[in-house]
Amino acid sequence: EMQRSLVGSEMCIRDRYAKALGMNIKLLAECKHVDGTLYAGVAPVLLHAEHPLYSVNGVFNAVFVKGNMLGDAMFYGSGAGKLPTASAVVADIVAVVQNQGRDIMNFWSEEKLTLEDRSKTSKKFLVRILGNEDAFKERIGNDFGEVRFVEAGVNGEFGFVTPVMTEGEYEEKAKAYPEILHMIRVQEEV
């Protein structure tokens, strides 16, 4: 089953950290097929200003594709909000009615795909911790390696960005920190 994380009520605080990093938070659906392994997931992710999806806002959605022959391509347009959604639903209903009793080519297979365990995927992580940065600095450096501390002007907490590691490695290290308030993935590559 595909894992998902939803954007919660702490969005304002997360936005402050994103701004401090010169990044933007986007709800990102990812699907990657690398060396015979398939990964899919949905989660809020921090994107750099150079990423094509950085500036997608409002009722617009975008699909960013990295193809082996095509290279990078982005498809962009209305897709969120009540009018675009209603239009898509009506179009689907019309297509069903128009094709009643007909065989439509179906390219879907009955074979269930096995997805890569999310714990094996690699990213950087922005981690928010309750407390004072000075009290944790040495310990965090020892446990997580070379991190980038982030000052977002939020009272009583601080943040840091980890080096690239697997999600499983992050989860294991995070167990030693009950003070962790939140983690968000950082998308490094375009």
Segments predicted by a language model, with ranges:
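Secondary-structure transition/turn motif
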Residues: M11, P44-L47, V164-M165
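Flexible loop/N-cap segments at domain edges
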Residues: Y17
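Catalytic, metal-anchored helix/loop core of enzyme active sites in primary metabolism
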Residues: Y39-L130
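Hydrophobic helix-and-loop "lid/oligomerization" segment in the mid-to-C-terminal part
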Residues: K26-A29
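Short, Gly/Pro- and small/polar-rich lid/capping loops
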Residues: K32
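Single conserved hydrophobic/aromatic residue that forms the stacking wall/gate
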Residues: E1-G8, C12-I13
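A conserved regulatory-domain signal marking ACT and ACT-like small-molecule sensing domains
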Residues: I93-V190
